[in-house]
Amino acid sequence: MKKIAVITGASSGMGKRFAETVDRYGTFDEVWVIARHEAQLEALRATVPFSVRVLALDLTDRGSFDVYAAALAETPVEVGLLMNCSGYGKFSAVLDTPLAVNLNMTDLNCQAVVAMCQITAPYMPRGSQIINIASVAAFQPIPYIDIYGATKAFVLSFSRALNRELKSRGIGVMAVCPFWTKTAFFDRAIKSDETPIVKKYAAMYDPDNIVARTWRDAKRGKDVCKYGFVARVQAGLTKLLPHSVVMDVWMKQQDLH
């Protein structure tokens, strides 16, 4: 029986960082990396010291889940780790964003997470773990990042509930809620031909520090991982203040009306 790890969104950003360092978490016979861009996944495979299987799949296409399910079924495997890192956001008013983009975002950020968890969990033995990338945006509504924030709130809530459901099977689930992080996320989130909506960042963290904290908290069996003083303060304040006040502060900080 081959022991594997499965990582989505592995072609760039946080997903790539996790794929490059997964051997810090544990030892696997093979690491399956999933993303749309096959060339980038192949480049990743050439740089890591462990066996990698490339699955070039678009997780907004529901047919991709059939391909993934078939790949699991055709080879005797146990999945020791599932990491759902696929996702993106847009800094834009809802009505200024094409409907297709907003629906695609919800498909990738939410439906793909549900599908990957449900398909993979039957192959996960006791002691295995699911890690879903959420965001500190999950803790409050954020105007002009509406869809992204709402999808990450879904991921956080889903992950915590699933963690409780799978406890009897010995499978842990953790949601990672980072603050602003220096990745390619911003290349897709910001329209290059317009004045950025988000102008001020309270902090910007190094992705390597997020990765290290994630591996540490996963080994400790936590259900939520938050890195950085600012992230913890923001998450804490959303429990104390009305969300209307939190949104007012955000709008004022970004000079929005």
Feature map (PLM): residue ranges:
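Conserved NAD(P)H cofactor-binding loop of Rossmann-fold oxidoreductase domains
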Residues: C85-K90
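Residue(s) in the substrate-gating loop at a strand-loop-helix junction
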Residues: S135
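Conserved glycine-rich Rossmann-like NAD(P)H-binding loop of the short-chain dehydrogenase/reductase
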Residues: G26-A43
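Substrate-binding pocket helix/loop in short-chain dehydrogenase/reductase
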Residues: A93-L95, V101-N104
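C-terminal helical subdomain
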Residues: A175, I197-R232
